[in-house]
């Protein structure tokens, strides 16, 4: 099974000002020598995912420098962490317009690796996770799309991507930042796609 990791570099990071004044959210230092982006990259590597792409756009120079200096695979492993920056092309004129647009515009670069599954992760969330379990569940359930969720309280729900699932775990309703809502399962920006 060929699994590729796709890590989202995020937007302006206004809630982390002044830390994001001159750097992308995933480049914010943690614990002295690490960056936020090191967590999802480590989750991928520790789960056996060796082909990783990082989508960037905002204040991304220090993030690019960190990736180039930190993540080097030997030439025989076939692994890599590659940065895919937003770019102007004949089909688009600049910045990514959200998560789906970032993935859509970058497909041509990671499809060269012919993945069976693409694991999409946020580049600025702190959690340790063995992705093997969710990949195994995705395969076992023959899903086209798997989205990780977490329960949230009503006060937090209105500012997140919120969904409702049926008894089989299938998504039946999804709303992005819906304001007041009775739905209390939030997307963690961890998704698997065939």
Placement of each model-derived feature along the sequence:
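Unchanged
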Residues: 1-194
